[in-house]
Amino acid sequence: TTSELATHVKDKIDEWNIDNIYIDSAAQQVKADFAYDYDIYCENAIKSVNDGIAALQVLIEKDNLYFDTEGGAHTYSAMTSYKWNPNTEKPKPIHDWCSHPCDAMRYAIYSHQKMSNISVYA
């Protein structure tokens, strides 16, 4: 439920001192509920697929992306299993079990970089 999710998000905000939360622009009702009912404010994620993936690849190649392989085992497994569809004209990732955790990482990392004016290429 939204209430359970909000409680979990608030716990993580407090535990990790989180300043920014990015949300899929398709989840506007959740964004509104979070703000109105739970005082959790989210920004719409920048959802550029190829640019976001490229930003993550740079962090990985530079060894600047840390995974808690115990607490983040599912996300780590998804990131290392992510595949591109070889049967499309334009580069497009395969939509499978990896998609949601990888999209969440992409949204968070790329949105934070762009909105904070941080360059991963420096």
Regions found by a protein language model. Name each.
Residues 1-94, 115, 120:
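Mg2+-dependent endonuclease catalytic cores in nucleic-acid-processing enzymes, primarily RNase H-like
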Residues 95-122:
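Charge-patterned, long linear interaction tracts outside catalytic cores
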